[in-house]
Design a protein with these regions (language model features):
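Catalytic glycan-binding domains that act on GlcNAc-containing polysaccharides
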Residues: 1-150
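Extended ligand-binding clefts on enzyme/binding-domain cores
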Residues: 146-163
Length: 173
């Protein structure tokens, strides 16, 4: 739903795609959750970790975990670490039956049918052509606002929500 303010986020360059791929593949071997599903979640949640900031619900880190959930599945890791967060996502999905019912596990991760479809669609695209991750990786970050889609470039930083009009006046698009 479009909002009249831009979020209290920081947009940083994501980790190198090679590092992310290594983390996805390592976790696939450990948890049985396909690398492309882990990558799709990372893309949807934080554009591969470039979006830094808590969600409106309080979720944190590259894979957007609630701190209590991360504590249960993160094996003592750092919620803000891409590798630790990806590992926790694999652990969470595996514990929620990904091997037998991926859609159920994905729904437990984010209880929205549209989310499950989006993860599956992006995962299928990356599984069919692993080079697709490079294309997704290079996407810009846009935020849906009442003024339309607003580009949030690398370097965007807001400590608190910013009225869209104020931001666009200072950063015409």
């Amino acid at each position: 739903e479009p909002r009249g303010t831009l979020p209290a986020w920081r947009i940083n360059p994501p980790p190198p795609v090679e590092e992310l791929l290594a983390a996805y593949r390592d976790d696939e071997a450990a948890s049985g959750v396909g690398w492309s599903h882990l990558a799709a979640i990372n893309l949807i949640e934080t554009h591969f970790g470039s979006v830094n900031g808590a969600s409106s619900a309080g979720a944190q880190g590259p894979m957007q975990f609630m701190p209590s959930t991360f504590a249960a599945y993160g094996m003592g890791g750092d919620i803000r670490s891409p590798r630790d967060s990806i590992m926790a996502a694999g652990n969470y999905l595996a514990a929620n039956g990904f091997a037998n019912n991926p859609d159920h596990a994905l729904f437990r991760y984010n209880n929205a049918d549209a989310y499950v479809r989006a993860v599956n669609d992006y995962a299928a695209a990356m599984a069919a052509d692993p080079a697709a991750i490079g294309a997704f990786y290079r996407w810009d970050v846009y935020y849906v606002s009442t003024a339309g889609d607003v580009l949030l470039p690398i370097g965007y930083a807001a400590e608190s929500p910013i009225p869209v009009g104020d931001y666009l006046a200072a950063h015409p698009q």
